[in-house]
Design a protein with these regions (language model features):
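Short, small/polar-rich motifs associated with maturation and membrane association
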Residues: 1-362, 394-398, 407, 423-424, ...
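Short aromatic-centered micro-motifs
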Residues: 55, 84, 192, 500, ...
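Extracellular/periplasmic, surface-exposed regions of secreted and cell-surface proteins
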Residues: 141, 189, 273, 299-302, ...
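C-terminal extracellular loops and terminal segments
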Residues: 150-156, 724-733, 775-806, 842-855, ...
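Exposed, low-structure sequence patches enriched in small/polar residues
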Residues: 512, 569-573, 758, 805-816, ...
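Glycine-rich, aromatic-lined ligand/substrate-binding cores of catalytic
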Residues: 845-877
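C-terminal beta-barrel architecture of Gram-negative outer-membrane proteins
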Residues: 865-925
Length: 998
């Protein structure tokens, strides 16, 4: 179905053509035939006028286009015929039959080939595309309870990995990775473009405002964004106002319940006494505490959205206001936010100018928790939570005790953040056709300028009172801190588009200029030892700690960056059969060395619609078949603003000749040769539509090579001041296959069934770690595991190997004392104490080789049902909770596996071996949505929809730890928790919603 944004744009073009071109299709005059004037109106199936529709007299080839009200007037011979056409609609031929007034209703084309897809700085019909671009309409997006739009895409697009390791935490945000890891240390996330403005924030978008999302996955599509396109581009198209002259009001509300899943079998007090206190009777503190339950609650979220939309063909508007109150499943986490969005679009009466403006303010008040469940897991269950004799009523853990009273922390500690966001943009466009007065109705010449600003102000406050357990132990009468961070980004985009069709040739061209300037600033201050707890963090100056000699308990910063670009693109097609696209972006960034600030990012793509060839006409079951190839160069500049410059920092106070001096010096090795990280991308694709458009989809093979990777590299000292330098070293390669298929299996009057299958493979390899300047390093270790016992590194990134390799000892059993035995490099069994780094090897990989999903959609009369499955295969997970809490030698509380599955390991500590590596494959019943829609069409109520959604219902897996989808698979340490063991429990989620349209 056509999206509203496309209709708006094409209608606007129609208006401009009407008012300025004076177009008339010329043909041979039919003097011998008697003609009469025939007028009429062209509308769509909803009754809205179709502006700019072509109305051609079949016999004379003369014609016109419909005006702003969809009306037309033509001279037609007796018994003549009219051919009425418009982009995205089925062409109709109408017999006049001596009628003077006609009404023509155009139907949208049933095929997805004419679906409009947003590309960089423009739109295209799907059948014209020569790149790997995925389009998702609003109705196909996930039903979510948050304003984090990234979760809308989970499982919807092949090779788009959306990971959220704490879905029930209202303050956690998902991470997005497209076609695998693309860098060592530079940014890994895609560029977000909202309504054509680069640099958007997916957390500042109400899902109710989203019309569609387009994902640019390959280099040719994303190269138009140059240095910011290396990790792919996500284009979010927001809804605009209606044009039927009516005011439409929509109210939607939902309530979400999150119930934590207790996936770890933690010992209770009785089990703890039976197993642990035999060897250490003093560890029994006499209580019976369930720390997990004590910090867990039922998470409840309320969302309300009110939308007003209206206007006519010249002016339309849309205003949205929303409120969200979310409570997480732990005692502390909550989030309250208020937001709005206002959009207005106007075309002048003469059709020469078009103006549009958007403003999106949002205020967020949140409380975050840290390390809640790591403490809940490891705390001694015989340790009491409360103590009536303490100053604040909570039991104070003795100094040196493992863990902490996390219930006290959640209730007594203040740790809040207030965030104020303001995003606005304004666009002015001019139709340049009147300057040339063309006679070609297919010609467009339009120039537009967009200015925008995105500002984020963040205020953090933290306070622990004098009665707080750790403060009492440390003899501190309260601690407090305040932080303020401000980020402002300004954009200017000037784009001119031209298109024309000459017989069977269509040419489109675009040129543009972009200017981006960002400033980040902030300050922080802290103090201790207050005379009163009453003012919390609101009177830092009253603390006594900062007054001590030499104390520096405050700081500030400011930095900026600039990005300037010139870009262009040319599209050509012949009969929509042979397709060609070329683009180039010339871009300069202030973040790189003096001689390397500018870079060129070209792209070329070709397509061949084989189905239009004569030799394919006999294959009636093939509706459309297109092959395409593209190559594009992208860049990555997501690094620190001053990484290429010499920077200095304070090193404290030092004595010299009896005097104290504040000493400054270089903060890092300077690299004036720092330059772009480049991605060389190739893609071969096949788009198909079969069996009267019942089966549609695409198949892609991609090859992406990232060179001059940005990151830290080890260097000798001296001659260098520091042991690492931030530079361009290394090459990384990703290859894979993608399949996206939709099958419209059943379509009757009352019942429909369709399903969508999405799947992708990924083969990742780190090709090299050296270049002509920096040589010798073949690998670097990553994922340093947290204490106790200083376990070391879990993974290694190495030349010729995949990212995510576990580099560990190989488990060979235990000795008579219950300590680890391992295999050495020769295959001999030795005690773990004799093991060296040379005895370690690659024992698994945490990066999935295959990811996929399947969504089933059913409708029966007014009911609709959606069932989505999602999974991953071909990867391993390091069971961190078994590693830290599943061994008898650990001093914290343990999982029951320490005395069941791992009972034979009695003295062995947490040594990194492949014993803890398990297959991570899983298949998840991800979500089920059942809805009922009442189309009332009453005077005051147009439509009511009720729905219920259940998320995260069940996971099929052989993994013995927590939900495998809570392990991070994006980034450089897939299959782990990044070296720690803190996690946020998986939760069953149920959403109940109501939508009313007036």
């Amino acid at each position: 179905m056509k999206n509203i944004h496309f209709k708006t744009c094409t209608c606007l073009l129609g208006i401009l053509l009407i008012l300025f071109s004076g177009i008339q299709v010329k043909g041979a005059s039919l003097e011998v035939q008697q003609e009469s004037k025939v007028s009429g109106t062209v509308t769509d199936e909803k009754g809205e006028p179709v502006i700019g529709a072509s109305v051609v007299v079949v016999e004379s080839k003369q014609g016109t286009i419909t005006d702003i009200d969809g009306k037309f007037l033509v001279n037609v011979p007796k018994n003549g015929h009219l051919k009425v056409s418009y982009i995205g609609y089925e062409t109709q031929e109408v017999a006049v039959k001596n009628r003077q007034l006609l009404k023509v209703i155009l139907k949208e084309e049933s095929t997805a080939l004419n679906e409009v897809v947003v590309v960089g700085y423009g739109t295209m019909k799907r059948k014209e595309m020569t790149s790997a671009i995925s389009h998702i309409g609003a109705k196909d997006l996930n039903q979510i309870s948050s304003l984090d739009a990234s979760m809308l895409l989970q499982g919807k697009v092949s090779s788009v990995s959306v990971s959220n390791t704490a879905l029930a935490d209202p303050n956690n945000q998902g991470s997005i990775q497209i076609r695998g890891v693309s860098s060592r240390n530079a940014g890994l996330g895609p560029l977000i473009v909202v309504n054509g403005v680069p640099g958007g924030d997916m957390t500042n978008i109400n899902p109710a405002d989203i019309e569609s999302i387009d994902v640019l996955k390959d280099g040719a599509a994303s190269a138009i964004y140059g240095t910011r396109g290396s990790n792919g581009v996500i284009l979010i198209n927001l809804k605009k106002g209606t044009k039927d002259g009516q005011v439409h009001t929509t109210y939607s509300t939902s309530v979400t319940f999150n119930k934590a899943k207790k996936e770890l079998d933690i010992m209770n007090a009785e089990e703890y006494r039976a197993y642990r206190t035999v060897s250490n009777p003093l560890s029994d503190m006499g209580a019976d505490s369930d720390w997990f339950d004590a910090v867990t609650q039922l998470g409840v979220t309320h969302m309300h959205t009110l939308t007003f939309s209206g206007g006519n063909a010249r002016t339309n508007y849309r205003v949205t206001a929303d409120y969200r109150n979310a409570r997480g499943i732990d005692l502390r986490s909550d989030r309250r936010e208020y937001g709005a969005r206002a959009n207005i679009n106007h075309t002048t009466k003469d059709g020469l100018f078009t103006f549009s403006a958007n403003i999106t303010p949002r205020v967020i008040d949140r409380n975050k928790s840290a390390n809640v469940y790591s403490n809940a897991i490891k705390n001694n269950p015989t340790m009491p939570i409360y103590d009536s004799e303490s100053a604040n009523g909570y039991y104070r853990f003795p100094s040196g005790t493992e863990g902490s009273n996390i219930v006290e922390q959640l209730n007594e500690e203040e740790n809040g953040t207030e965030i104020k966001l303001l995003e606005w943009n304004a666009t002015a466009a001019v139709n340049l056709l009147p300057l040339f007065n063309p006679k070609n109705p297919d010609m467009v010449l339009k120039s537009q300028v967009t200015i925008s600003q995105y500002q984020v102000d963040k205020f953090n406050g933290w306070f622990t009172p004098s009665t707080y357990g750790s403060n009492v132990n440390d003899g501190v009468t309260g601690k407090a801190s305040r932080d303020f961070d401000k980020s402002t980004t300004n954009n200017l985009e000037w784009v001119t588009n031209f298109s024309t069709r000459i017989k069977n040739h269509q040419i489109r061209a675009m040129v543009g200029y972009s200017y981006n300037y960002g400033v980040n600033s902030g300050m922080s201050a802290e103090n201790w030892n207050f005379s009163s707890d009453g003012l919390t963090y609101n009177n830092l100056g009253s603390g006594l700690e900062a007054a001590k000699d030499g104390k520096t308990m405050m700081g500030s910063y400011k930095n900026d960056h600039k990005l300037i670009s010139f870009f262009g693109r040319v599209n050509y097609d012949w009969k929509e059969r042979y397709l060609f696209t070329f683009s180039l972006r010339h871009e300069g960034s202030s973040r790189f060395g003096e001689n390397h600030k500018w870079g060129n990012f070209p792209a070329v793509s070709v397509g061949w619609r084989i189905s239009d060839e004569k030799f394919m006409k006999g294959l009636s079951w093939i509706d459309d078949l297109k092959v395409r190839y593209d190559y594009g160069v992208t860049g990555n500049q997501e690094i620190g603003n001053y990484n290429s410059l010499a920077t200095y920092r304070a090193f404290g106070w030092y004595q010299y000749n009896g005097n104290r001096f504040h000493v400054w010096g270089p903060s890092k090795n300077t690299n004036s040769e720092l330059r772009w990280e480049k991605g060389h991308n190739q893609n071969v694709g096949l788009d198909f539509s079969l069996f009267s458009h019942k089966v549609t989809g695409s198949f892609n093979y991609f090859h992406r090579k990232q060179s001059d990777l940005l990151g830290d590299y080890s260097v000798p000292v001296p001659p260098n001041l520091f042991s690492t330098i931030y530079t361009n070293v290394g090459t990384l390669r990703n290859t894979g296959f993608e399949l996206d298929v939709t099958v419209n299996a059943v379509r009757t009057k009352d019942f429909t069934y369709s399903f969508t299958l999405v799947g992708a493979t990924n083969n990742n390899k780190f090709v090299s770690f050296s270049n002509d300047v920096y040589k010798g390093q073949k690998y670097y270790s990553t994922c340093s595991m947290a204490n106790p016992n200083n376990p070391g590194y879990l993974q290694r990134i190495e030349e010729g190997e995949r990212i995510g390799n576990y580099f560990t000892y190989r488990y060979a059993g235990v000795d008579k004392k219950g300590d680890w035995l391992i295999y050495d490099k020769k295959g001999n069994v030795i005690p773990v104490a004799q093991g060296t780094e040379e005895d370690k090897s690659v024992t698994g990989n945490g990066l999935p080789k295959f990811t996929g999903s399947m969504t089933h959609n059913f409708t029966y009369k007014n009911f609709d049902l959606s069932v989505a499955l999602r999974g991953a295969a071909g990867f391993d997970i390091f069971n961190v909770h078994d590693f830290y809490f599943g061994l008898q030698s650990m001093t914290t509380n343990q999982l029951t596996t320490a005395y069941s599955k791992n009972a034979h390991i009695t003295t062995g500590k947490n040594v990194i071996t492949d014993y803890f590596i398990e297959p991570g494959d899983y298949l998840k019943i991800d979500n089920v949505t059942l809805g009922y829609t009442m189309n009332l069409n009453k005077k005051y109520v147009e439509k009511i929809r009720l729905f219920g959604t259940a998320n995260n219902l069940y996971t099929f897996t052989k993994f013995t730890g927590v939900d495998p989808s809570t392990y991070e698979v994006n980034g450089l340490t897939p299959g782990t928790f990044g070296g720690g063991y803190n996690y946020y429990p998986s939760a069953f989620q149920f959403i109940l919603g109501l939508q009313v349209s007036f």
